[in-house]
């Protein structure tokens, strides 16, 4: 639409592009929502675009498939989830995930679904290791999502936030292991910044002019660290930024930084990589 004042290409008035448009057959593509296998109204992203273009057809995304599974109840019947809850009954359940409604890497609704399953299975010790966004959503909006999650858990009387960490640390994808190590140490060893609540941890970061993605790994509840025998689920459905922390938690020959191997049951929302849960 050449009258679209929000379209940068239109506003640039590119002579060559406009000539091609006027002289040759052309069409347009939808890049969001149901047209690319996402929920209605959900924006697309690079991974979604590449997958649909390369496939030449609509590919229903992990976000959509998992959401449908949750709505139908099939989510809780999957063997991995059943095993996760069975192991957690003996000790503790830990959820790691990006707490926002950006829906690019993780869905807050999926995190809530796992917590509801824990409640329905009578699991007493449920801890959330909240990763903060600030990239797929506004730079400083984490407190709203954290309060929403805390309210949900309080209503169920199930779960508490044990640690928070900006995605800059916990969701690195370029082998910058010094960042991942900080997140790992908070989640496993209870080492890092200290705060009495998740929102306080975020505010401490804001006071230092650091937005959500740069919140230093912070311990809220030292009793909520991952220990041998615990059950862990990484709730991110997009693999690329979940791999490194997962490797640190489960690979026996991990060499990104020094740490003692854990004996845990770990699941991930999707297959991150061959050799990982």
What residue ranges belong to the model's regions?
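Active-site nucleophile/metal-coordination loop of metallo-enzymes that catalyze phosphate/sulfate
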Residues: 2-168, 178, 182, 254-277
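Conserved phosphate/oxyanion-binding catalytic-loop motifs
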Residues: 238
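Conserved beta-strand elements of the Class I
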Residues: 94, 231-233
């Amino acid at each position: 639409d050449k009258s679209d004042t929000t379209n940068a290409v239109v506003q640039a008035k590119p002579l060559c592009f406009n000539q091609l448009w006027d002289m040759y057959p052309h069409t347009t593509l939808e890049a969001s929502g149901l047209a690319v296998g996402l929920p209605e109204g959900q924006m697309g992203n690079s991974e979604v675009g590449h997958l649909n273009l390369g496939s030449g057809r609509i590919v229903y995304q992990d976000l959509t498939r998992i959401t449908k599974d949750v709505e139908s109840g099939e989510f809780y019947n999957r063997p991995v989830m059943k095993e996760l809850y069975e192991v957690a009954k003996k000790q503790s359940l830990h959820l790691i995930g990006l707490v926002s409604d950006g829906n690019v890497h993780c869905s807050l609704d999926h995190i809530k679904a796992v917590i509801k399953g824990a409640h329905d299975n009578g699991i007493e010790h449920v801890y959330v290791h909240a990763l903060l966004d600030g990239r797929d959503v506004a730079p400083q909006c984490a407190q709203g999502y954290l309060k929403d999650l805390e309210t949900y858990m309080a209503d169920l009387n199930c779960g508490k936030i044990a640690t928070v960490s900006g995605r800059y640390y916990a969701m690195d994808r370029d082998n910058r292991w010094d960042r991942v190590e900080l997140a790992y140490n908070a989640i496993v060893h209870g080492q890092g910044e200290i705060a009495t609540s998740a929102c306080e941890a975020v505010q401490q970061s804001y006071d230092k002019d650091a937005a959500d993605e740069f919140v230093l790994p912070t311990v809220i509840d030292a009793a909520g660290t991952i220990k041998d025998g615990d059950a862990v689920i990484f709730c991110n459905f997009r693999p690329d930024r979940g791999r490194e922390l997962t490797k640190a938690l489960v690979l026996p020959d991990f060499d990104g930084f020094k740490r003692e191997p854990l004996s845990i049951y770990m699941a991930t929302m999707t297959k991150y990589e061959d050799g990982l849960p």
